[in-house]
């Protein structure tokens, strides 16, 4: 987290507008600053520009899917340190394996309860802080 920030910044990459607004509202209500992206390409651009503390990345998006966007973010020295949580409706083990394979730091199955989302985001932020102190 950038020290001058009062609240952790979460970049939410989700192409479905209703879901994007719902998750954004959950997170803002819980004390996070939230910026959004509509597709994987926009998520990469915004991540480089904003340097968020965490990215919630929908797996299935137009232009560039979340898996490829995650690969590119983890390959870039400017963004590889940012924790990424996969956000997907696919709860199967294959989706979890794919998330790990592309570099995601965690997995959130949607729809999810607001408290579950916030708990996973906080846990990923805590894990990211621990890694950065090593």
What role is predicted for each listed range?
Residues 21-29:
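Charged docking surfaces used in two-component/phosphorelay signaling
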Residues 61:
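Receiver (REC) domain active-site loop signature in two-component systems and cognate sites
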């Amino acid at each position: 987290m950038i020290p001058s920030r009062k609240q952790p910044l979460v970049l939410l990459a989700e192409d479905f507008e209703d879901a994007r607004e719902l998750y954004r509202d959950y997170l803002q209500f819980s004390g996070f600053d939230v910026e959004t992206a509509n597709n994987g390409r926009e998520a990469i651009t915004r991540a480089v520009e904003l340097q968020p503390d965490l990215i919630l990345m929908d797996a299935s998006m137009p232009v560039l899917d979340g898996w490829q966007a995650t690969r590119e973010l983890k390959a870039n020295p400017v963004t590889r340190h940012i924790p990424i949580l996969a956000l997907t409706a696919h709860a199967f083990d294959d989706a979890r394996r794919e998330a790990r394979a592309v570099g995601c730091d965690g997995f959130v199955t949607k729809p999810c309860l607001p408290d579950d989302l916030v708990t996973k985001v906080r846990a990923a932020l805590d894990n990211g802080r621990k890694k950065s102190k090593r």
